[in-house]
Amino acid sequence: MKKVLRVYGGVMRLVRLLPADSRPYYAKYARENFVNYREVDQSETSLDELFQRAYNHSLWVLKKYSIDESAATKLKEICFE
């Protein structure tokens, strides 16, 4: 559970780097996804897949807004530890 909260916090920190007008959308999107997946099977494999998906989606959004991917380094460390 702690890792899930750390990943969520990492995603929300990245949302703060986005342009002000797009932050509410992505903050809501991230929250809804984390809430929807809280019922997921707690096997290690499925959580790892969700963490990888969160990281990949974060990279896509950063790239969309021309933000350097290195901003997601900490999230990568959390997701793949």
UniProtKB/Swiss-Prot annotation:
Annotated InterPro entries: Complex1_LYR_LYRM9
GO CC field: cytosol
Domain of life: Eukaryota
Family: Belongs to the complex I LYR family. LYRM9 subfamily.
Name of the protein in question: LYR motif-containing protein At3g19508
Species per Swiss-Prot/TrEMBL record: Arabidopsis thaliana
